[in-house]
Swiss-Prot record:
Pfam families: PsbQ (PF05757). One of its GO terms (biological process) is photosynthetic electron transport chain. One of its GO terms (molecular function) is electron transporter, transferring electrons within the cyclic electron transport pathway of photosynthesis activity. Its main location: plastid. This is Oxygen-evolving enhancer protein 3-2, chloroplastic. Belongs to the PsbQ family. Residues 1-64 form a transit peptide. Keywords: Chloroplast, Membrane, Photosynthesis, Photosystem II, Plastid, Thylakoid, Transit peptide. InterPro entries: PsbQ-like_dom_sf (IPR023222), PSII_PsbQ (IPR008797), PSII_PsbQ_pln (IPR054099). It is found in: Plastid, Chloroplast thylakoid membrane.
């Protein structure tokens, strides 16, 4: 009973031991922080902190210097493609009609022969990719150059006299047969087959180019 009365008396007076202890700790922390601030005032460490805060960041100064030295020149020239394609940015040239932007354009026979020779050389240049076994690149480049060859050879054959068309058609048929075999070898990732049909394709290209003159 006496303990209960003592507890009630403490509560009525607003005394809480935990709260009193917390206030004491807060006071100690405040006093200690104040003492730390008094000891730092005017010291060398505080001088360095003030100097760092007042100076501009180093990255900002470097960035400002870099901006001053940047020189903007003229835009680069359009990158060139195969002869007759004008440039590789043709599909993004909005001044051209859609048909001219996304489809191969017919060329005069003389220019078609020139592009046939360029495409043939590009196919011959696939040998390093075959040696490296870069099969996706072999297939992509081979199909692209073969599409140019097929299109331009049709133009050239159509311009030839009747007696020359038959022999030229036979040579081109043999050429595209070996190109298909080379494409299949690249698809199967077979190095021996790819080397075999690359040699056959190279010979067939030589026969066609010799016929064109």
């Amino acid at each position: 009973m006496a303990q209960a009365m003592a507890s009630m008396t403490g509560l009525s007076q607003g005394v809480c031991p935990a709260a009193a202890d917390s206030r004491t700790r807060t006071a100690v922390v405040v006093v200690r922080a104040s003492a730390e601030g008094d000891r730092c005032a005017g010291g060398p460490r505080c001088d360095r902190l003030v100097a760092t805060a007042s100076s501009p960041p180093l990255s900002q100064a470097v960035h400002a210097e870099t901006v001053k030295t940047i020189k903007i020149g003229a835009p680069p020239p359009p990158s060139g493609g195969l002869p007759g394609t004008l440039n590789s940015d043709q599909t993004r040239d909005f001044d051209l009609p859609l048909k001219e932007r996304f489809y191969l354009q017919p060329l005069p026979p003389a220019e078609a022969v020139a592009r046939v020779k360029t495409s043939a050389q590009d196919i011959i240049n696939l040998k390093p990719l075959i040696d490296k076994k870069a099969w996706p690149y072999v297939q992509n480049d081979l199909r692209l150059r073969a599409s140019y060859l097929r299109y331009d050879l049709k133009t050239v054959i159509a311009s030839k006299p009747k007696e020359e068309k038959k022999s030229l058609k036979e040579l081109t048929g043999k050429l595209f047969s070996t190109i298909d075999d080379l494409d299949h070898a690249a698809k199967m990732k077979s190095t021996p087959e790819a080397e075999k049909y690359f040699a056959a394709t190279k010979d067939a290209l030589g026969d066609v180019l010799a016929k064109l003159g």
